[in-house]
């Protein structure tokens, strides 16, 4: 270092010492005030300097350091996006609990984020800290992306048409069993009642999913204290877990205990089937025991298979439960649509004289359109994230998203835009007339990320199951499960709101999944009071 530079450093240190001496001489109240003000001064100064950069998306101004725009975004994300879109356009950034999130709204945003190169953005880096404590190690986001793609392929073996044909009667059996035995219905004892759909639908969802995907042994365990373990594990999916994945709190300890206990139970069943050579084509457990060897010859361990089973079951639990709840709530407001759906059921099922089959579900366009419209109005996840792994240029702009930022896409916001869906806030199942198919992917070229060919196009304004390499593989199972559930509801009962004038409750965005605000209750009546189920 030159003599000139050395003297500058010495001089700077003298100024720092002088400043510290001055600060220490101040009264305590003034020192506290300065310490409190400094982070705010730094935050505002940093934002002013940031705004001078023309290669960065505009940043939403915020006052509170670290917290940023967490409150408006966390409570009313779609209103927040709309306000920002009016000010900045489709591309902007905001501070969220220490993370800078770059948002790209609309179909072009879908294309930019869902079809981004693996080297550019990572879902694993964005979500692993949340999902790994719940699902377990070695699966989903706790493994290299190519491993996840192969895991999805393994699971898809249990999500074929042949499997759905087997699942439909199992799901139906569970629904009628719930109607008979649950205190929410007791349908053979009561002809009417009031039920909170955010109590009934999570229970019905896990019962039907576990019976079809995991087999009778696992389903039967849910009638015991084992059900509380699922509840404890479920509580690991909250916003606080996303921000703070590990804290010395009771619900974190219960989450970890539940993960070990549930995966241990799965492993015991796997071991038992293997020892008895009892591997058939019953469920997902059988499928993974037969087919869970990676391309490089590595086999999944029993622990990893157990963890993947948890991931599959829990990954779809919230979304399907919320969607079925929203279906019931919208139909409670629309007796005319209930009647339309009922008449369709009678036509297809010969006045309810034949058992429902998977092929029957494919011949119920109005039922599928109702599910499709519900998913449009209530995308289960209002935001989807990726962490930026290296600087990424946004096409046709001067913007570059730096490494370690996050990018955010919101198909749910696009679903509610007049530009793409006339009268977007109206529940209208006939907007899908002639387009009842469940598949949401845009047509065109296909690509195989390792779990089977899917549409490469993600520029559709309707993407309830995401897109790209992380597109949900459970779409057809969700339609099967929801279709059977709603078919039986429609044929078994009519329902409305308990109080005259009640309407569909607003969305609660404070959880990880978009849920109806409590109370979310319906009054149900059996269509045929004399009938036993």
Swiss-Prot record:
This is Lanosterol 14-alpha demethylase. GO terms for biological process: ergosterol biosynthetic process. The keyword Metal-binding applies. It catalyses: a 14alpha-methyl steroid + 3 reduced [NADPH--hemoprotein reductase] + 3 O2 = a Delta(14) steroid + formate + 3 oxidized [NADPH--hemoprotein reductase] + 4 H2O + 4 H(+); a 14alpha-methyl steroid + reduced [NADPH--hemoprotein reductase] + O2 = a 14alpha-hydroxymethyl steroid + oxidized [NADPH--hemoprotein reductase] + H2O + H(+); a 14alpha-hydroxymethyl steroid + reduced [NADPH--hemoprotein reductase] + O2 = a 14alpha-formyl steroid + oxidized [NADPH--hemoprotein reductase] + 2 H2O + H(+); a 14alpha-formyl steroid + reduced [NADPH--hemoprotein reductase] + O2 = a Delta(14) steroid + formate + oxidized [NADPH--hemoprotein reductase] + H2O + 2 H(+). Belongs to the cytochrome P450 family. Pathway: Steroid biosynthesis; zymosterol biosynthesis; zymosterol from lanosterol: step 1/6. Heme binds at residue 472. Its main location: membrane. It is an enzyme of class 1 (oxidoreductase). It comes from the Eukaryota. Its EC number is 1.14.14.154. It comes from Candida glabrata (strain ATCC 2001 / BCRC 20586 / JCM 3761 / NBRC 0622 / NRRL Y-65 / CBS 138).
């Amino acid at each position: 270092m030159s003599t000139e530079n050395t003297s500058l450093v010495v001089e700077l240190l003298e100024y720092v010492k002088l400043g510290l001496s001055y600060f220490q001489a101040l009264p305590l109240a003034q020192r506290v005030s300065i310490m409190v003000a400094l982070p705010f001064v730094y935050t505002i100064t940093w934002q002013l300097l940031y705004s001078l950069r023309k290669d960065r998306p505009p940043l939403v101004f915020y006052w509170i350091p670290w917290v940023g725009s967490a409150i408006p975004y966390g409570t009313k994300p779609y209103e927040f996006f709309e306000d920002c879109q009016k000010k900045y356009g489709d591309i902007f950034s905001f501070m969220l609990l220490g993370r800078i999130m770059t948002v790209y709204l609309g179909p072009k945003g879908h294309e930019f984020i869902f079809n981004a190169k693996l080297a550019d953005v990572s879902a694993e880096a964005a979500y692993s800290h949340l999902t790994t404590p719940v699902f377990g190690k070695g699966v989903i986001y706790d493994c290299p992306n190519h491993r996840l793609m192969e895991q999805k392929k393994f699971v898809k073996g249990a999500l074929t048409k042949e499997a759905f044909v087997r699942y439909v009667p199992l799901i139906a059996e569970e629904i009628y069993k719930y109607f008979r035995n649950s205190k929410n219905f007791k349908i053979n004892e009561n002809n009417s009642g009031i039920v909170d759909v955010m109590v009934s639908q999570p229970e019905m969802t896990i019962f039907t999913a576990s019976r079809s995907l995991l087999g009778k042994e696992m389903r039967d365990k849910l009638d015991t204290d084992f059900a509380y373990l699922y509840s404890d594990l479920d509580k690991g999916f909250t916003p606080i877990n996303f921000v703070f994945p590990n804290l010395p709190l009771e619900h974190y300890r219960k989450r970890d205990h539940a993960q070990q206990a549930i995966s241990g139970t799965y492993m015991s069943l796997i071991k038992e089937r293997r020892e008895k050579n009892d591997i058939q084509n019953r469920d997902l457990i059988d499928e993974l025991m037969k087919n869970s060897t990676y391309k490089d010859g590595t086999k999944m361990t029993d622990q990893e298979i157990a963890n993947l089973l948890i991931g599959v079951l829990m990954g779809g639990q919230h979304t399907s439960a919320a969607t079925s709840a929203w279906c019931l709530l919208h139909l409670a407001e629309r007796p005319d649509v209930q009647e339309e759906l009922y008449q369709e059921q009678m036509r297809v099922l010969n006045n309810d004289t034949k058992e429902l089959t998977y092929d029957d579900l494919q011949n119920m366009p109005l039922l599928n359109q109702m599910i499709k419209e519900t998913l449009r109005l209530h995308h289960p996840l209002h935001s989807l994230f990726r962490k930026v792994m290296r600087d990424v240029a946004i096409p046709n702009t001067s913007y570059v998203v730096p490494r370690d930022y996050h990018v955010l896409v919101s198909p749910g916001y696009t679903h509610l835009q007049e530009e793409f869906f006339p009268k977007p806030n109206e529940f209208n199942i006939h907007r899908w007339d002639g387009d009842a198919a469940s598949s949401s992917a845009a047509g065109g070229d296909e690509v195989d990320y390792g779990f089977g060919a899917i549409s490469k196009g993600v520029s559709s304004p309707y993407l309830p199951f995401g897109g790209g390499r992380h597109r949900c593989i459970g779409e057809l199972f969700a339609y099967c499960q929801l279709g059977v559930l709603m078919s039986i509801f429609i044929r078994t009962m009519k329902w409305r709101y308990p109080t005259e004038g009640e309407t569909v409750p607003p969305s609660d965005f404070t959880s990880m999944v978009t849920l109806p605000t409590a109370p979310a209750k319906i009054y149900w009546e059996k269509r045929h009071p004399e009938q036993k189920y």
